[in-house]
Amino acid sequence: MHQKLVAVDWGTSSLRGALINSDGAVLEKRAFPQGIMQVAHGQFQNVFEQRFADWMTDDMLCLVSGMAGSRQGWREAPYCPCPSGFEDIAQHLQWIEKDRIGIVPGLSTFNDATPDVMRGEEIQIFGALNTLKIETAQLVLPGTHSKWAKVLNSKITDFKTFMTGEFYALLSQHSILAKTCLPDAPLKKEVFLEGVMQSQKPGGLLHHAFSARSLALFEKLNPAQSSSYISGLLIGEEIKSAKSSMQSDSTPLFILGNSQLTQRYAFAMDALELSAQALADEVTWSGLWALAHHLYPDHFKLS
């Protein structure tokens, strides 16, 4: 019988783990700058044992989400097609050791015949549903590659990816805009919202992005402000594009992620008259524990 869960989130640049007891309480957490890109081929088992062997007693279950299931990871866990819920993910777990160490698969969907994928975000989404005790929602997960997901009856039915964070890095550090931008400057809310509102006007992102350059040339933006303006342009463009495929206004909208990013999205949505609730709490551990409950309901009991 499994007494506890070792929950692991193994991403591109970081490795995190949590020791969780059978009723869902987190007992201990660990984090290392040892993502899959820092692990040599064939060394995943060794790294896992170095970091978590003391947790892995005979009565433990371990579930690993994130990029560990990619082709460059520990073992590939093929994508589950949407719609997918816990039952679908459970059926497609890749077991390193049967009933002991399992790799969680990501999800795939098609938008206008074009594939889209996620790895790790699906666990955050299910964690949010478990935390909120809801079955239907739409969720935004800001990041390097932001996700907008739809959930109906506890199944992720569809999602879209936006390269917002990556475009911010490219524009603010590797384009002509970098000459007049401090990419790590603190958020200037008023200037950020100017960028958000500018993004809603005709012309499109390729046109509006150059306004960050021209405003700087005419001394309407200084380098510390320019980063907020560019961020507002990009997040505003993302929201404008995503709004067209959102579910009805009555379906609750949640923002998942670190507080700095969720704050920006909350500011932008408020300015655009979209109602959304930001969730600052850690939901990955809740999602992996909920999956463990689905797999072994007699071992991991809902409170």
Q: Which positions does each model-derived feature cover?
A:
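Adenine-nucleotide phosphate-binding core of ATP-dependent small-molecule kinases
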Residues: 198-239
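Glycine-rich phosphate-binding loops at beta-strand->alpha-helix junctions
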Residues: 14, 250-268
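Short beta-strand-loop/turn "lid" adjacent to the catalytic site in phosphate-handling enzymes
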Residues: 55-118, 153
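Phosphate/pyrophosphate-binding loops at sites that engage ATP/ADP/AMP, CoA/4′-phosphopantetheine
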Residues: 48-61, 239-249
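Short glycine-rich, Thr/Ser-proximal phosphate-binding strand/loop in the N-terminal lobe
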Residues: 5-43
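Glycine-rich phosphate-binding loop plus the immediately following alpha-helix
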Residues: 37, 108-142, 147-202
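Glycine-rich phosphate-binding/hydrolytic loop that grips phosphoryl groups
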Residues: 274-303
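Short glycine-aspartate micro-motif
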Residues: 5-9, 61-63, 137-141, 254-255
